[in-house]
Curated annotation (Swiss-Prot):
Cited PANTHER family: BETA-PINACENE SYNTHASE-RELATED, TERPENE SYNTHASE
Protein name, UniProt field: 2-methylisoborneol synthase
Enzyme's top EC category: lyase
Name of encoding gene: tpc
Gene3D superfamilies per the UniProt record, alphabetical: Farnesyl Diphosphate Synthase
EC number(s) recorded for this UniProt protein: 4.2.3.118
């Protein structure tokens, strides 16, 4: 997703963003002391993952599928009738009219019936100044027979044998088609992201399916587009600065710093500001960052936008560590690699789930150490998923690419197969730790905004795995089974 020429005026107007939530200052985290939590850890986890039938992959010969682990709840279990999720809230009333989509793409409805995860997620604003932090409003849990089965055949793609994961319903095809149409128009007309010869790679990215799967509670396609533009922009920076299309570790720090100013603007003197502003249009990654962030800040609160900027700084720091190792030919220890991957990972994507969902997790609740642990574990687990599914793709690419199986094989003197299987075990342990930490936080702080955010992060983790599994254009599994 690279540069296709110098910046010029866009040939089409961008879609109108969803109305921003209220921008009241952050308040102290809510304290709940008088309402006991009735759901157990297992019940909370079961409520995150409605049952979905998928064809199963053959088990690994050296270890049983992780879903059989007795210490974790099965992904197909349902919460008992006594467990009630937070009640749905009224959807926000936008102060700006949404973009009128084609007749086939509903804009103002919540996720369709196929997005059954959203049936357990309250919709509407939960920002400051609303009633979202009230714990009095509850409703009965949706009974299992009220959850519609996914419509249509599931996309094909094998699951890594032994990988602990949760299947998801098929993403709404109407939303997928509309997001795909809009993001391609944005990439080609507004930011001119790639030359014509790279169009097939952009289409093969399947970002529309990706974002619809990861954000089942997004109230409109406009909200989905917030995440989709940012995802495409992040990948443009990775591809053009670090990886496939002209990327190099040499000079990466300077390129990343200047690109980051498209997210976190330079404040300087009148003499030098015009030159900086002009630089934001000098290449495709910066054009994409600038446009995607402009859309995002119009819909997000100031604290949500600042949260995203900090998470992107973390990502760029991880890029620089990996680049430094590439320049010197250093293969890190496994713990060093995992530390790098805690920064060079998907964290900026799930942590905008509240903005995409049309509500806000207040800054004080986001900053809680237990919430930060949940977010870190989710990002780490999803990033190892990427290592596992992109393993053969990276082996076939020029140069040496570090991923967890490669580092384990090198540092622990294991065969490629045994190292890959151990990486699966690392992923599974991270996933179990993420789910346990999320359940503990839900029990300790059962505030509706917290519960919804946790469900949003879990949905992103599941959708991210499903996209890797189904994207056979990009990924294939090694022949280890």
């Amino acid at each position: 997703m690279p540069d296709s020429g110098s910046l010029g005026p866009p040939t089409s107007l961008p879609e109108q963003p969803p109305a921003p939530p209220a921008t009241a200052p952050d308040a102290p985290a809510a304290t709940v002391t008088d309402r006991p939590v009735t759901s157990s850890v297992a019940h909370f986890l079961a409520g995150l993952h409605p049952p979905v039938t998928r064809p199963s992959s053959p088990p690994s010969p050296s270890m049983p599928p992780a879903s059989s682990n007795p210490s974790s709840p099965p992904s197909s279990s349902m919460p008992p009738a006594s467990w009630a999720p937070p009640s749905p809230l009224s959807p926000p009333a936008p102060s700006l009219p949404p973009t009128s989509p084609p007749a086939t793409a509903p804009e103002t409805s919540a996720a369709t019936g196929s997005d059954s995860v959203v049936r357990r997620v309250p919709v509407g604003p939960t920002g400051l100044g609303t009633t979202a932090l009230s714990l009095a409003r509850r409703q009965a849990a949706v009974p299992p027979d009220a959850v519609p089965a996914p419509s249509g055949p599931s996309a094909e793609g094998p699951v890594v044998p032994g990988l602990y994961h949760h299947p998801i319903p098929e993403p709404d095809p109407v939303r997928v088609a509309e997001v795909s149409r809009r993001i391609k128009r944005w990439a080609e007309d507004e930011v001119r992201l790639y030359p014509e010869e790279w169009e097939g790679q952009f289409d093969g990215f399947s970002v529309g399916r990706y974002m619809v799967a990861c954000h089942p509670d997004a109230p409109t396609v406009d909200h989905l587009m917030l995440a989709t533009r940012l995802m495409v922009a992040e990948n443009a920076v990775d591809d053009c600065y670090c990886e496939d299309h002209g990327g190099s570790p040499v000079g990466l720090g300077g390129r990343l710093l200047l690109a980051h100013t498209a997210l976190d603007h330079l404040h300087t003197t009148a003499e030098y500001a015009p030159e900086w502003s002009e630089s934001l249009g000098s290449d495709a990654p910066r054009r994409a960052y600038r446009s995607a962030m402009d859309h995002f800040v119009r819909a997000a609160t100031p604290s949500q936008a600042d949260r995203y900027r900090h998470d992107m700084a973390r990502l760029h720091l991880g890029y620089l560590a990996e680049a430094a190792w590439a320049e010197t030919g250093h293969v890190p220890e496994v713990c060093e690699y995992l530390a790098m991957r805690q920064f060079n990972n998907f964290r900026p994507c799930p942590t905008i789930t509240d903005t995409v969902g049309g509500y806000e997790l207040p800054a004080d609740l986001h900053a809680r150490p237990d919430m930060q642990r949940v977010i870190a574990l989710a990002g780490n687990a999803t990033t190892i998923v990427n290592d596992l599914y992109s393993y053969t793709k990276e082996l076939d690419s020029p140069g040496r690419h570090l991923n967890l199986p490669v580092v384990i094989a090198e540092r622990e003197h294991l065969s490629d197969r045994d190292a890959y299987l151990k990486a699966v075990e690392v992923h599974n342990e991270l996933m179990h730790a993420f789910e346990a930490a999320a359940a503990e936080l839900a029990a300790d702080c059962p505030v509706p905004a917290v519960l919804r955010f946790l469900r949003g992060v879990a949905a992103w983790v599941d959708g991210n795995h499903d996209w890797h599994r189904t994207n056979t254009y990009r990924y294939s599994l090694p022949d280890f089974w």
